[in-house]
């Protein structure tokens, strides 16, 4: 109290709206949003889904933070989180679930990698 709050962006990249893991992650961040804000974090989600999909995802899950529709894949490529994935033996291009903590000067302070992200407890990882 009385000191200036340092705002950090928690820019989290996720594969797809309405999927189980992405919904669990978004809802965990939603449920802990006030605690994240008190600690000086702004939460911003990014996926390659379009704005209409994001709006449905926000409304269905009552998300209090913005989602960026990176339909041209500029952000996922710039942050290095777009690449070949595989599921059930099928290879495809997709987003690696990754979170970047960016300070007020725009410098990446910390990266929570795809192997580290816990979708159901992600807010605690950020804090």
Where are these regions (language model features)?
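Short, small-residue-biased leader/transition segments that mark boundaries at the very start
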Residues: 1-7
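Short secondary-structure boundary/capping segments
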Residues: 3, 35, 90-92
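Hydrophobic beta-strand anchors of alpha/beta hydrolase catalytic cores
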Residues: 10-11, 43
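Short beta->alpha linker loops
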Residues: 14, 49, 70-71, 118-121
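Structural microenvironment flanking redox-active thiols in thiol-disulfide oxidoreductases
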Residues: 18, 23-66
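Short, internal strand/loop/helix patches
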Residues: 44, 55-96
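Thiol-/selenol-based redox modules, centered on thioredoxin-like
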Residues: 93-127
